Amino acid sequence: TSVVVTTGGGSSAPFNVTLASVAPTITLALGSTSEGLFYTLKNVQVTPTSLANPGDTLSLYATGLGDTTPAAPVSGVATSTLPLSPLPTVTVGGQSATVLFAGIPSGFASLYQINFVVPKNVQGNVPVVVSIGGQSSNSVTLPLFGISAVVNGASFLNTGTAAPEELISIFANGLGNKDQDFDFPSTTVQGVSVTINGIPAPVTALAASGSQINLVTPSNLPTTGTVQVQLTTPSGTSVDFPLIMNAAVPGIFLVADPSNPTAQIAVAQFANTVWLAMPTSTAVALQIPQNCTASNANPLSICGQPAAPGDTLVLYATGLGEVTPNGDPNGTPLGTGVVAPANASTLYETTATTTVTVGGIAAKVLFAGVAPGTSGEYQVDFQVPTGVTEGDAVPLKVSLPGSSTAAATLAVHSR
């Protein structure tokens, strides 16, 4: 079928379209490219600041759902409610929702309303899809109270797994609007708390404006199986969010490069300095001094340069698993919310063997454990091996038995 638009005495060129009995499309919220237009039974629009809850009955609006009974008028608005039969299906977060009504309401023209019940086991920002006649609609986002994702606090990878004593970030709706940068080891900040298998988790930061809360997983969690994460805020308590536990889920902290947003540069300092190992271009983009060694820079002043074979670096990570004094497998693990001694009077090292590879070549690991004065933040001291193929983005990986990091990068150049 061809469509021609005529206006002001002129006509457009024909535009070919394919007609189908159904072509479901969910209406988007005004100004959004992803959020659907949803309303509660009280005709309140659902938005990121006015959330719906699991179990709520909501309405969405869509086009292209096909014939009603009786049929809709060819032109003008419906003068009575025109129901659809059979009903479309609605999935919310991959779960089937109960559809209570679908049709064109009285006073509407070609715009369908679907009333449905949000499944009780979904939460956070979830996708919604309408299907009818073998066709599925666009996927839109429904903002619900609760947790959207739990990610590694260093790499921000969403693997659905975590380890005891790991820094994690939870992205969730309903955290309020007040940020609090650091209140460790408090387990409640601005009325927001998280439990994992019923154990309160120490909070490191609440970024409510970014829908994010950072915390350290309790050290006495199991290292296998699934645990349940539950969020409590002044608005209520979320449904359980499942999280698979492993002995280690390592993740490397990364440097943000303004000149290369996709870069995966590891946070690694030169030993006994605050200099950072990075490409010269990254140091320039960050507007920090370069050529630290050649310029004899102050070791306590920020500076950036590539590492060289033989250099000793301090890499920062999380999720390396159980730590005890000197890595003694029979020692007492660092407790939940306990900070490793800042004066390094006792070094809490990983009980599992930690390995580092640079460009696929094994590096000599000098220390792997919780950084003194921290909890959940690990440091790995290692020497850059010789024989590495040099470059600005040499693959760097940390591994423990049964797990390893996604490959970060390290700039390596001889000097």
Protein language model features and the residues they cover:
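A sequence-level detector for low-complexity, Ser/Thr- and acidic-rich stretches
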Residues: 1-415
